[in-house]
A protein has these predicted regions:
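A generic structural micro-feature
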Residues: 32, 125-127, 157-161, 282-284, ...
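Active-site beta-strand/loop signature of hydrolases that rely on acidic residues for catalysis
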Residues: 37-42, 64-87, 135, 167, ...
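Extracytoplasmic/secreted proteins, especially bacterial periplasmic and envelope-associated proteins
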Residues: 59-70, 85, 89, 130, ...
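Structured beta-strand-rich core segments of catalytic domains in phosphoester-bond hydrolases
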Residues: 81-184
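Metal-dependent phosphoester-hydrolase catalytic domains
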Residues: 211-221, 228-341
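N-terminal, active-site-proximal structural segment of metallo-dependent hydrolase catalytic domains
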Residues: 2-11, 17, 21-96, 106-119, ...
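Short catalytic/ligand-binding loop motif for oxyanion handling, primarily in non-cytosolic enzymes
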Residues: 45-48, 84-87, 109-113, 131, ...
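Surface-exposed cleft-lining segments at the edges of enzyme active sites
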Residues: 49-52, 147-156, 183-199, 230
Length: 341
């Protein structure tokens, strides 16, 4: 989300008409040397935000759980897990299908089940966690957290331990690393050039951090809410610059006109509601969420960048042109299946 950290940190001290889009089918478990990745900003603010802004986390969380379960990806990256009750519920609900998961990035600054924590992690009572977590059907052999050193001063992200999780997944003896992350958000009163510069610096942090841990040993996939505007940022070169900064290939549903944008307020009733809460346009449309892979000398990569789809799960009886009143988040999930060497 563009401004979730604004509200979360503050309380710590649905234009275009959709036509011809149908719900994406649930992914089947990948077979052979493949790994499917599902990434979603689930928009679950802190308990105080939830109460003061009437965000109904208790009602939305079971829908989040249901959507994750039905898409059945091998690995799930979640962002904006700021609500501790929702996080505990999701862990419990997914336990049978996803018995392995990392902790939430930035919840603690040492120990906590991580093999290592790096970056600028704060233990201050005025700083919230980073909200990012990885779930897996398959064993996680190692897990690392990095809290970004680069953050835009004067924005609410500055008061969050946002960063990235890195998990080594062992699927039937084939090891693949997965990065889950949530980059700097835009904020009213701060230049987008400034926040985009921070995002590029954060992607550079990810590249250096991952290279230092993984080297060329195995493929590295990445997913999450990068807050990189595929459409609105085209004139700035945001997408190309993001790929260059992270040293990788970022897949997006934005290249397929039949797909929803990952933040699609004209379609999503919840996106419209959150526009009113967070002061972004209630007709906002852009793709901010990506899945892809990272390059490094000698490192194996997927055979090709797969098609990335926006998972769309509207209410029963939905037809094109109606608002989606089922979505529990202002973002739609993205998903892809990677064929690995």
């Amino acid at each position: 989300m563009r401004k979730r950290a604004l509200l979360a940190a503050t309380v710590a001290v649905a234009s275009a008409v959709l036509t011809g889009v149908t719900a994406a089918p649930a992914a089947h478990a990948a077979t052979g040397n493949s790994l499917s990745v599902f990434a979603w900003n689930v928009d679950l603010g802190t308990s105080i935000v939830d109460s003061t802004e009437n965000e109904n986390a208790a009602g939305r969380t079971p829908v989040v759980e249901q959507i994750i379960q039905q898409h059945n990806a091998d690995v799930v990256v979640l962002d904006e897990l700021f609500n501790h009750s929702s996080t505990s519920s999701i862990e419990s609900a997914l336990a049978a299908q996803y018995p392995y998961h990392t902790p939430v990035v930035g919840q603690v600054c040492s120990g906590g089940g991580w093999n290592g924590i790096s970056g600028d992690c704060s233990n201050s009572w005025f700083v919230i966690n980073g909200g990012t977590m990885i779930f897996s059907k398959y064993p996680i052999k190692a897990q690392y957290a990095h809290v970004f050193s680069n953050s835009t001063s004067g924005t609410w992200d500055y008061n969050a331990n946002k960063g990235a999780a890195l998990a080594e997944i062992d699927k039937n003896g084939v090891n693949t690393w997965v990065v889950g992350t949530h980059l700097q958000a835009d904020q009213s009163g701060t230049s987008t050039d400034t926040t985009q510069s921070t995002r590029l610096a954060q992607l550079g942090e990810i590249q250096g951090w991952v290279n230092g841990i993984v080297g060329s040993s195995a493929p590295v996939l990445i997913g999450g809410d990068l807050n990189v505007e595929y459409f609105h940022g085209a004139s700035r070169g945001d997408y190309a610059n993001a790929q260059n900064a992270v040293g990788g290939v970022l897949g997006t549903p934005a290249t397929d006109p039949s797909q929803l944008t990952t933040m699609d307020c004209p379609v999503s009733a919840w996106c419209q509601y959150m526009g009113g809460v967070e002061s972004f346009p209630t007709n906002y449309q852009d793709s901010l969420d990506y899945v892809g892979y990272l390059n490094a000398p000698g490192r194996p990569t997927p055979l090709a960048l797969p098609s990335v789809v926006t998972d769309f799960d509207p209410q029963a009886g939905w037809t094109a042109g109606q608002l989606d009143t089922q979505s529990p988040s202002d973002h739609y999930p993205v998903q892809a299946t990677f064929q690995l060497p």
